[in-house]
């Protein structure tokens, strides 16, 4: 391929034309005909378990960025992963993902701030995707409903159905295209239509509706009949406000992803899902939950009697085909409570009492505890399998019980705490619990007024990722950096959204022999940040690979020491201010003198 391209005209038009017609070139050009055969052999050389995982990728559209977490949890639900030699199903599936990356069968998509896993997302190269689609169809594994797809005959025992955003068929076409009684997964990428769920789908295990438009509350009632479901994603379905009680019948459910919905309360019946391992929620609405659960019930009666006929006439703002129940849910669970309690945190969910019954939970978040009783927090303490917990709504009434709860979760690896009261510092919570955090904690996120970092944070020898921000108001930049610089395992550091008290002259300095393991540094919207300096007279951040600087209402005056960072690969500078030619010129000069030849990416714009 390289030799062929080297002999082509070096013009943008020619290369663009080749890129658009690469499949045809591979078929017609004798010089390139060997490439597909090589790629096919790379597929055929995969072990059986990786072949299944690779063919599964044909579900996703062209050039689609596929989340590692999404893939891993779907593979688990499909039975592609199992516990092996003491490794959990998630660890095994993660290993499969990395094996496909290492074999270059799938391509990594790197984000500015990676997770503990290193690679968060992947893509399929167009040529590998063609192989995946072809083989998956040959084996009746995956069928894609898309514009131009043939539905003239019923497909035999198709396992996975993907509905593309450009498919405009009707119910008759849908039911004639696939034998619904055999499908194990349904993935919708476009607009939701009610006939996508059928009582014939008796063995459906995976229902992935991430980003689907037109899905409203009353559609969820039909999903409750699919009792073999193990994975449900409603992520970014932002017209969903409430889960029905009937979802308590989904006793096989392992993963429930509600991030980006407007759900604020979980029904009591959720505690029947004793196999649930992953519960994700982070809303996108104003404060929308009641303090004791009584207000929405009373408002529902009022709304049903008086308001619905009028409101339903004005429901054009809701996507899909909302009925009176959807509109009433919106007003009674969102609008009225929001007006009553404007100061509540706009994100997170309220979990029901008896959440302790969900003993299999590994991941729980984002939980809003602003008005949770002590018994609710004690319930969370009994979730002894928890590896990841995210909590918001911390205030002076609940912080002591929260500290006690976290202390009791000995297996916790990731913790996020968001404080919502400006009248009291998160400092009080952390000062009162010097042994608060499990020693094997790997990821910690602290949002709220801190004033200073406690000395005990230096005892977190296993901490790999740390994020501090949202009005943390740390008073001493140097003291903060000295404490953090001593963490031996810290690889990812994010300081964001006013982590320091605004002084107008903030200078962040990375001293010699500090941050021995730091690989990713993200400084985001630190108002008053004037300079970032890496001391050149010694080993400073010797493993740093990625530096991201993001700012809005200010300009950096100086960035220095980049030429001495031995492993630096990439510097990203972005924000909504004009480029400072002097600073950018200095950065380019420093990077040109860095022996590792790091890449500079600049994305500055003005509103």
Where are these regions (language model features)?
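Conserved hydrophobic beta-strand positions in leucine-rich repeat
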Residues: 161, 186, 207-210, 229-235, ...
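A structural signal for short secondary-structure junctions
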Residues: 408-409, 436-439, 447-448, 458-461, ...
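Canonical leucine-rich repeat
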Residues: 217-218, 242-243, 266, 289, ...
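Conserved "Asn-ladder"/turn position within leucine-rich repeats
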Residues: 166, 191, 212-214, 237-238, ...
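Tandem repeat protein-protein interaction scaffolds
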Residues: 216, 221, 230-233, 240-246, ...
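Beta-propeller domains
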Residues: 435-478
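Surface-exposed helical/coil interface segments that assemble multiprotein signaling complexes
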Residues: 4-53, 58-226, 248, 268-272, ...
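Leucine-rich solenoid repeat modules
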Residues: 526-607
């Amino acid at each position: 391929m390289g030799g062929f391209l080297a002999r082509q005209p070096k013009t943008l038009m020619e290369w663009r034309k080749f890129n658009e017609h690469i499949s045809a070139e591979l078929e017609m050009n004798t010089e390139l005909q060997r490439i597909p055969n090589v790629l096919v052999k790379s597929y055929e050389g995969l072990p059986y378990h990786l072949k299944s995982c690779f063919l599964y990728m044909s579900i996703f559209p062209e050039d689609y960025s596929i989340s590692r977490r999404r893939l891993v949890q779907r593979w688990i639900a499909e039975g592609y992963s199992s516990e092996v030699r003491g490794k959990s199903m998630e660890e095994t599936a993660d290993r499969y993902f990395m094996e496909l990356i290492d074999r270059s069968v799938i391509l990594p998509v790197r984000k500015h701030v990676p997770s503990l896993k290193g690679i968060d997302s992947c893509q399929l190269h167009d040529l590998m995707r063609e192989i995946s689609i072809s083989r998956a169809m040959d084996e009746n594994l995956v069928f894609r409903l898309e514009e131009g797809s043939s539905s003239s005959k019923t497909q035999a025992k198709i396992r996975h159905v993907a509905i593309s955003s450009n498919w405009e068929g009707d119910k008759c076409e849908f039911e004639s295209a696939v034998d619904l009684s055999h499908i194990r997964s349904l993935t919708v990428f476009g607009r939701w239509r009610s006939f996508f769920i059928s009582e014939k789908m008796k063995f459906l295990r995976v229902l992935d509706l991430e980003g689907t438009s037109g899905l409203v509350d009353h559609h969820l009632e039909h999903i409750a009949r699919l009792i073999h479901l193990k994975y449900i994603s409603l992520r970014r379905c932002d017209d969903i406000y409430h889960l029905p009680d009937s979802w308590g019948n989904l006793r096989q459910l392992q993963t429930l992803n509600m991030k980006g919905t407007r759900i604020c309360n979980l029904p009591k019946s959720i505690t029947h899902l004793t196999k649930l391992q992953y519960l994700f929620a982070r809303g996108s609405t104003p404060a929308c939950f009641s303090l004791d659960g009584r207000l929405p019930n009373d408002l529902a009666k009022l709304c049903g009697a008086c308001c619905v006929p009028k409101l339903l006439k004005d429901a054009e703002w809701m996507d899909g085909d909302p009925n009176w129940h959807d509109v009433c849910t919106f007003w009674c669970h969102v609008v009225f409570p929001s007006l009553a309690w404007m100061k509540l945190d706009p994100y997170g969910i309220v979990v029901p009492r008896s959440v302790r019954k969900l003993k299999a939970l590994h991941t729980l978040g984002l939980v809003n505890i602003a008005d949770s009783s002590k018994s609710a927090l004690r319930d969370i303490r009994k979730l002894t399998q928890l590896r990841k917990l995210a909590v918001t709504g911390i205030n002076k009434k609940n912080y002591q019980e929260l500290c006690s709860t976290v202390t009791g979760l000995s297996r916790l690896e990731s913790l996020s705490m968001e404080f919502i009261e400006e009248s009291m510092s998160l400092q009080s919570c952390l000062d009162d619990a010097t042994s608060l955090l499990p020693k094997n904690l790997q990821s910690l996120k602290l949002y709220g007024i801190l004033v200073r970092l406690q000395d005990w944070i230096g005892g977190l020898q296993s901490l790999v990722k740390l994020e501090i921000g949202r009005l943390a108001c740390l008073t001493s930049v140097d003291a903060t950096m000295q404490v953090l610089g001593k963490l031996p395992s810290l690889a990812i550091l994010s300081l964001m959204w006013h982590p320091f008290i605004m002084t107008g002259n903030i200078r962040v300095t990375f001293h010699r022999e500090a941050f021995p393991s730091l690989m990713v540094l993200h400084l985001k919207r630190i108002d008053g940040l004037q300079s970032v300096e890496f001391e050149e007279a010694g080993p400073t951040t010797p493993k740093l690979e990625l530096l991201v600087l993001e700012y809005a209402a200010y300009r950096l005056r100086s960035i220095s020491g980049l030429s001495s960072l031995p492993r630096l690969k990439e510097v990203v500078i972005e924000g909504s201010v004009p480029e400072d030619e002097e600073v950018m010129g200095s950065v380019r000069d420093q990077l040109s003198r860095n022996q590792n030849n790091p890449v500079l990416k600049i994305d500055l714009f003005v509103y």
